[in-house]
């Protein structure tokens, strides 16, 4: 496992919630968007993505609905709920605090 994948496991929920902010997406599109926005640094495997989506759905932070993908295939589309938007704000604040703390250590040593 690469270091970027190790980091990804600790931030996957945050990344999924953030990527879903503009609107509903199916699983493959979520993974592609994370890869695209991270300029190919972060790659989300299906074996990590779908359990995370189910966990987020169980927490009522995302909801899933069946629809048709851009290639006319049936796919489950995930979207943020009101609770998901609130959770995203909380997660973003936590991430900012953590990344600021790490940056502080890296600058000082």
Regions found by a protein language model. Give the residues of each.
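Accessory beta->alpha helical hairpin/"wing" motif in late/C-terminal subdomains of nucleic-acid enzymes
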Residues: 80-84
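Basic amphipathic alpha-helical segments that dock to polyanions
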Residues: 49-56
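Beta-hairpin "wing" of winged helix-turn-helix
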Residues: 57-74, 79
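Amphipathic alpha-helical dimerization/coiled-coil segments
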Residues: 85-109
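Short beta-strand/turn micro-motifs at beta-sheet edges
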Residues: 2-6, 66-67
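Absolute protein N-terminus
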Residues: 1-2, 109
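N-terminal helix-turn-helix DNA-binding core of bacterial DNA-binding proteins
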Residues: 5-48
